[in-house]
Amino acid sequence: MKIKTVVSIVIISIILLCALFILFREHESLENNVIDNPVIDETSNQKPPEIVEQTIEEKVDKIINEMTIEEKIGQMLIIYDTHETVDEELKQFIKDIKPSGFIINQNNITTFDKTKKYIEDLKQNSEIPLIISIDQEGGKVQRLQNLEDEKATYIPSMLDLGKTNDIELAYEVGRVLAEDMRTLGINVVYAPVCDVFSNPYNEVIGNRSFGSNPNLVANMCVSLGKGLEDNGIIATYKHFPGHGDTTTDSHTSLPIINKSYEELLNNELIPFKKAIENDAKIIMVGHIAFPDLTNDNIPASLSKKIITNLLKNDLGYDGLVITDALNMGALINNYSDEDIYVKAVEAGVDILLMPSDAKKAIEVIKDNISVERIDESVKKILIFKYTYLKDNILDESYLNNKEHQEIISKIPIE
């Protein structure tokens, strides 16, 4: 009996020891699992760590910190190119200069497919998004009428559109322009014209203006600009501070407008003020002298008093400032290339349009302008690009389609 009792005790002890061993191993496994795969109590106040996304400004700051001074200045240049295709020479130019963008012109515009391919190839050869811009106002300035096979929608003059005083129609015309341009990959247009047609003998502006009433011009400009931008093309409001009251063509010589600050506020500046109030992103400064503002005959495009003091400080504009084309007679007949480049940047310009020599522009700006001033413009340019330049090309069927023609037919042509 005693032997049986002892045996029973031993067996029970062994069973208990085995059970304890199994429990110990399970507990150890559970602890290891907790360490490797923590379980978050959904009822607690603890939140999982958030993934912090890089802001556009942070991205731009990083890019600028990694750029050479030459690359920074390249971002301040928009190039006039004469190629029909992006050949090895042009690829090397883009690699060397790293320009901010190109202005599409009659030299680049051939067939629809070739022009589209040219623009695609420009973009593919640039690490930073390119501004692909064009003069496509309507009336006598619409470069896409040079397409050899499929014409863009023909837009009547802005003076004809202005006579309707129909801001909704102006918006729709902006949409038509935008959709045509997006079929090719264009993203910026040098329109609308904000000049008030106050001099009936002004042939250089003439019917490019919406009219002689500054408030009508303001309303039509802003509405057309909104039609452009709501449909993927960034508008450029031009030619600050106003090219409407002169008979001189700045393509050949320097216009001089003798108007006081008060006179400009009550006329020429009204459309630009309204554009600024409605978030204008680019304003083009014209090659026009206003001696009552500057006490000399310096063109507005080279004047700190007009660009920094008037446009930025007085009117509160903080968007991009671009020059009119730098190969125009108003400048090149009065200044050297070196003076043009340096004076424009000193005045407050961010982007130089069509410098005649990009390498020279980079050299003289590097030698005469502080890094801080260059960085100021480059940061604005890059923030603009990464915010607004979207690769949203439309199908070719949008070009000059039936709906576009129906909209344009509402503009009475005189």
Language model region names:
Residues 2-97, 149, 313-314, 334-414:
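Preference for extracellular/luminal or secreted protein segments
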Residues 68, 108-124, 130, 140-142, ...:
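Second-shell residues forming the walls of enzyme active-site clefts
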Residues 74-86, 158-171, 253-267, 327-335:
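Active-site mouth loops of central-metabolism enzymes
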Residues 78, 103, 189-190, 236, ...:
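Conserved beta-strand positions in the central sheet of alpha/beta enzyme cores
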Residues 81-85, 134-147, 187-197, 237-243, ...:
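Short glycine-enriched loops at secondary-structure junctions
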Residues 91-105, 175-188:
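Catalytic domains of carbohydrate-active enzymes, especially glycoside hydrolases
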Residues 109-131, 165-185, 379:
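Active-site-adjacent structural elements in enzyme catalytic domains
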Residues 156-186, 191-221, 225, 229:
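A substrate-binding/cap region within the structured catalytic cores of diverse enzymes
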